[in-house]
């Protein structure tokens, strides 16, 4: 995942990924291209075009996003701050399932998180997490979500369960 701020220039700025290319002429945008996940480009300001490897093309306007997965893609309006706040040391969640939160926390804190109870994976969370210590973040989530957890510092594995 990378965030770009590109000044206007005569030559195009192109970000190439295994999913396709994002072409820019002066803009701020985020590119999320993890293996086995949908490719997502989120535009804060300016203009970008996305061309998939199969030649499909989308032009984004500020406040929009292209999502590309399995040779299909769509665009949508989004709150860009949710997708770009990581660059400012925060993670923002709006009615986010616990399962999705886990993916973002695993990447940020370089840990493995295991859910012991399938019933809690769809618990919804709304909030902003400033990038504090991992233990402070866990206590915040525990205080606002009905979960229990244990963390093995040696293996860096967090196990989350229902209370």
Regions found by a protein language model. Give the residues of each.
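A residue-level detector for the "anchor" residue at the start of short, highly conserved motifs
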Residues: 1-163
């Amino acid at each position: 995942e990378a965030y770009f701020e590109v000044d206007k220039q005569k030559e195009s700025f192109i970000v190439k990924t295994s999913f396709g290319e994002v072409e820019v002429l002066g803009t701020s945008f985020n590119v999320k291209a993890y293996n086995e996940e949908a490719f997502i480009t989120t535009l804060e300001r300016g203009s970008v075009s996305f061309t998939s490897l199969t030649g499909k093309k989308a032009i984004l306007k500020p406040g929009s996003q292209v999502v590309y997965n399995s040779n299909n893609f769509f665009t949508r309006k989004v709150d860009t701050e949710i997708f770009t706040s990581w660059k400012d040391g925060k993670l923002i969640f709006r009615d986010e399932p616990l399962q999705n939160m886990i993916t973002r926390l695993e990447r940020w804190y370089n840990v493995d998180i295991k859910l012991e109870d399938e019933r809690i994976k769809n618990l919804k969370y709304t909030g902003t997490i400033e990038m504090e210590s991992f233990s402070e973040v866990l206590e915040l989530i525990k205080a606002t979500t009905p979960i229990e957890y244990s963390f093995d510092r040696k293996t860096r594995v967090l196990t989350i369960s229902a209370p």
